[in-house]
Amino acid sequence: MTGPKRLLVALDGSALEGSSVHKLLVAACDGARAAGGDAEHVRAYALAIKPCIACGPDATPGYCIFHDDMDRVYALLERAHAVVVGSPVYFDTVSGPLKLLIDRCNCITPLVTLGDGSQDCVPKWARTRRAAFVTACSTEHRYDLAERSVRGFLKWVGAKWEETLAWQHADNDLGSAPAEMLARARELGRRLIESAPLEAVVPGKLEAR
C-alpha cells in the first residue's frame, strides 16, 4: 500500500478487558497493523457520552448538538477505511454503552430539509468502508438480532457489513475464545485493511444492509 496508512476502527462493546469480544477485537487490530495499517480500539464502556435525544431535522451543521467523547468517535469513523464492531449479546442485542454510541451516530446520516421543502436522511460521507461484527454468546442463544442492529448502524456511518465472527460457547469462563478464533480475527483485520475501498454509493441513496 502507498499513501497514508489505512485505518481500522474497532468499537468494543464489552464490559471487560480480557473477554472474548475484547480479545477478538485486539486480534483484529493486530492483523490490521501487521498488514501495514493503523488501528484504533475504542471501548464504549470507557466513554462519557450522553444519550441521543431525537433532536429532529436540521439540528446542527456539524455532527451532534452535544460535544463529549463522541467527537473523537465521529472523527475516527470519518477517517476509517474499515470498521469492526464487537459486543456480547445482552437481551438479544448489543450492550448498553455500545447502543448509546450507535444511537448518537444517527447524525452521520441526519434528517435534513431539502431544497424543495421535503425531508430525507442524507449521509455526510460516502459508503466506502468495509465492516464486520464480532460477538460472543452462549451456544443456547442467538446473535442474529444483535447483528441486525449492527448492520443497520454500519450502513448509517458509511460502512457495509461483510461478515460476522461469532464465538458461541458452553462455558462461563472469561475470554474463552480459542486460538483458532483469534487467528480468524487477525485474518479479518488483515483482509479489511488490504481490501480496496468500496465503490462509493451515490449520496442520498441508501442501499440495503
Mark where each language-model region is.
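Short, glycine-/small-residue-rich phosphate/pyrophosphate-handling segment
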Residues: P110-K160
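Glycine-rich beta-alpha junction loops
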Residues: A48, S138, Q168-D171
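Short, well-ordered, mixed-charge alpha-helical segments that flank or form enzyme active sites
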Residues: T93, E140-Y143, D173
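Beta-strand-loop-alpha "switch" segments that mediate conformational coupling across diverse proteins
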Residues: E162-Q168
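Short loop/turn motifs at secondary-structure junctions
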Residues: D38, R79, R127, K160-W161
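Short beta-strands and strand-loop turn motifs
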Residues: L11-D12, G86, F133-A136, L165
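N-terminal beta1-alpha1-beta2 submodule of the flavodoxin-like/Rossmannoid cofactor-binding fold
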Residues: M1-P110, G175, A179-R209
